[in-house]
């Protein structure tokens, strides 16, 4: 188990930057070493860079599925925008992009209704994005799930409850478009790592409480 002090030594600390930026540097280096030379499963496709705060272009999404039948690429772009913000910048702000990691069988199926897993990434509430958990989510998808891997707003630029709001927005979004995405929301699962585990637990508790559901408009 690598502790925080050991992880910090892996980053190139810059005294001119805030401590949280240096910590982000260190975690990025550590995660890069963790994922070095990992290979993605050959029977899984990533549909990248959908946005859960924008209306889904269902025709564009359908066109992606159709185009896959021609060239069988393992990575399909819904939008070409970048995944991570500039980690050196004080204005580091996460976006609302998400990926679908799907079994290859999903791409050619009609009238599909796949079980779905929402994966909430870790990072101490101030670091990380969907790319850090892409390999992990693709391996989950091998078992026949559609796995949703997404970004959420991070501290310190975004104050509580920004992150948990984004978890709720994401779940509502995939529920709203479940038919388009071919999801069976009766077989819905969530998981999270570290900060993601806390956000997952908080979401599930709040979403199952009628008092919270009446006060907040973003729970499904």
What are these regions (language model features)?
Residues 128-136, 148-187:
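Catalytic nucleophile-loop/oxyanion-hole region of alpha/beta-hydrolase
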Residues 116-119, 147-150, 189-191:
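Structural recognition of the beta-strand scaffold that forms the well-ordered cores
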Residues 111-124:
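Short beta-strand element of the alpha/beta-hydrolase
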Residues 169-220:
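Primarily recognizes the serine-hydrolase "nucleophile elbow" in alpha/beta-hydrolase
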Residues 22-112:
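N-terminal cap/lid segment of alpha/beta-hydrolase-fold proteins
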Residues 3-16, 36-37, 55-57, 73-74, ...:
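Alpha/beta hydrolase fold serine-hydrolase catalytic domain that processes acyl esters and thioesters
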């Amino acid at each position: 188990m690598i502790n925080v002090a050991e992880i910090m030594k892996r980053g190139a600390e810059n005294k001119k930057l805030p401590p949280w930026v240096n910590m982000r540097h260190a975690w990025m280096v550590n995660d890069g070493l963790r994922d070095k030379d990992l290979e993605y499963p050959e029977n899984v496709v990533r549909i990248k860079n959908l946005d859960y705060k924008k209306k889904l272009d269902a025709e564009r999404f359908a066109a992606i599925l159709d185009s896959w039948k021609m060239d069988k690429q393992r990575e399909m772009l819904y939008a070409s925008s970048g995944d991570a913000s500039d980690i050196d910048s004080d204005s580091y702000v996460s976006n609302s992009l998400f990926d679908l990691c799907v079994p290859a069988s999903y791409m050619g199926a009609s009238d599909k209704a796949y079980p779905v897993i929402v994966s909430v990434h870790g990072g101490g509430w101030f670091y990380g994005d969907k790319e850090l958990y892409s390999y992990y989510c693709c391996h989950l998808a091998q078992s026949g799930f559609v796995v949703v891997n997404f970004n959420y707003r991070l501290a310190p630029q975004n104050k509580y409850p920004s992150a948990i709001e984004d978890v709720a927005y994401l779940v509502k979004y995939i529920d709203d478009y479940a038919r388009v995405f071919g999801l069976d929301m009766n077989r819905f699962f969530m998981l999270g790592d570290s900060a993601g585990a806390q956000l997952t637990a908080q979401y599930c508790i709040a979403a199952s409480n009628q008092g919270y559901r009446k006060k907040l408009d973003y729970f499904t």
